[in-house]
């Protein structure tokens, strides 16, 4: 996280938690000539709806406007949303939540000739994950060292 996103996370986390929400991620990006501050929030169980996001957006906007000195060098567009069904798995809390769920994993290097896997996360520890993948009509457990995981996210099984 950058200093701006860390500051935003520090501001948003208590606001979200006071409402029973969870801050999932903060992004501060420039696309074309416009800056965007994207804040992803969720609520368990059941998720967060658009009305709750709109209410939280107003609270967040007010708090960010009060920051002095202003941490944003340029005008930006504030976007609050849920992370969606295919939310990223970024931290240990996300990994624990993903246990038993269907996930997508991209790797830095190939394992068994593949750099991407989708399957059910059966187990994990600090060093590796165990993913149950379907190969044709059979299921197979694949152990993946965490240090070779480039990215991971929840996935929808078809």
Swiss-Prot record:
One of its GO terms (cellular component) is cytosol. The keyword Cytoplasm applies. Keywords: Cytoplasm, Ribosome biogenesis. InterPro entries: Ribosome_maturation_RimP, RimP_C, RimP_C_sf, RimP_N, RimP_N_sf. It is found in: Cytoplasm. Pfam families: DUF150_C, RimP_N. GO terms for biological process: ribosomal small subunit assembly; translation. Required for maturation of 30S ribosomal subunits. NCBIfam families: PRK00092.1-2 (NF000928). Belongs to the RimP family. This is Ribosome maturation factor RimP. The gene is rimP.
């Amino acid at each position: 996280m950058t200093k701006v996103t860390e500051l935003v996370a520090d501001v948003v986390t208590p606001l979200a938690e006071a409402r029973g929400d969870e801050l999932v991620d903060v992004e501060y990006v420039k696309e074309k000539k416009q800056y965007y501050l994207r804040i992803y929030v969720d609520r368990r169980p059941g998720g967060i709806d658009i009305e709750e996001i709109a209410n939280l957006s107003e609270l967040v906007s007010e708090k960010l406007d009060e920051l002095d000195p202003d941490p944003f060098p340029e005008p930006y567009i504030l976007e609050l949303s849920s992370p969606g069904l295919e939310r990223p798995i970024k931290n240990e809390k996300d990994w624990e939540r993903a246990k038993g769920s269907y996930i997508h994993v991209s790797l830095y290097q190939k394992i068994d000739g593949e750099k991407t896997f989708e399957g059910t996360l059966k187990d994990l520890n600090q060093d590796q994950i165990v993913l149950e993948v379907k190969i044709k009509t059979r299921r197979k457990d694949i152990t993946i060292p965490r240090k070779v995981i480039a990215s991971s996210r929840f996935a929808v099984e078809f």
